[in-house]
Amino acid sequence: PVEYEVNNTIGTLNVLKCASDAGVRRVVYSASSSAYGDTDKLPSVESDPVNPLSPYGAQKYYGEVMCKMFSEVYGLETVSLRYFNIYGERQNVGGAYAMVIGIFVDQLLKGEPMTIRGDGEQRRDFTYVGDVVNANILASQSEKVGNGEVINIGNGDNRSINEIADMIGDNKVNVDPVIEPPETLADNSKARELLGWEPKGNINTWIPKYKKEMGLDV
């Protein structure tokens, strides 16, 4: 928790302070859907209560609070984009920020089974990295934002971990679950309205391409 606090909370504060001092027009903050935590209300809307289940989720949410404060107090334009489960090229396959698709492919390449936490029925709103990049560009340019708005960046549908594993291979094993939300799903109507954003990534067609590029589908 201490390392996360230094990197996420203090790091964000430093960026906002430097941007304000340097006269930067706008900061687009990479927020996280982990702010929602475990919720029975889906899809998640930006006005929903926050309930982070981890230090990371809590600190990313506090970054949103700081962005809003810098807009109101110091006049720095800010907008916070809550990312939902990003996948795409060059994704991490190990470490704290590794995503499940990359982990599964890496495990199979090593001759290991895909490790599924719990029963695999937990669902995630997988969002293509190219769509996230486009959202950031639009957020930096849109005249409709800049006052500390919080905006979901998610595909707007979700898949179970079992579904993802089945797309990749059939060698899998179930291991002990971890504490995590059973499901995430974004309401992305605010992004469409304020940014003119529309997700275009298709995980069904992307995973086969990724497997081939990684040398798994031979």
Descriptions of predicted regions:
Residues 1-84, 130-133, 197, 213:
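N-terminal Rossmann-like NAD(P)+-binding domain of SDR-like oxidoreductases, especially those catalyzing
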Residues 7-10, 47, 54, 95-99, ...:
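Residue-level signal for the nucleotide or nucleotide-sugar donor/cofactor binding architecture
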Residues 61, 86-102, 110-112, 116-117, ...:
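Glycine/proline-rich active-site loop of Rossmann-fold NAD(P)-dependent oxidoreductases
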Residues 62, 66, 70, 100, ...:
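Hydrophobic alpha-helix immediately C-terminal to the catalytic Tyr-X-X-X-Lys motif of short-chain
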Residues 132, 136, 153, 164, ...:
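Non-catalytic, hydrophobic alpha-helical segments
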Residues 189, 203-218:
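Amphipathic terminal alpha-helices
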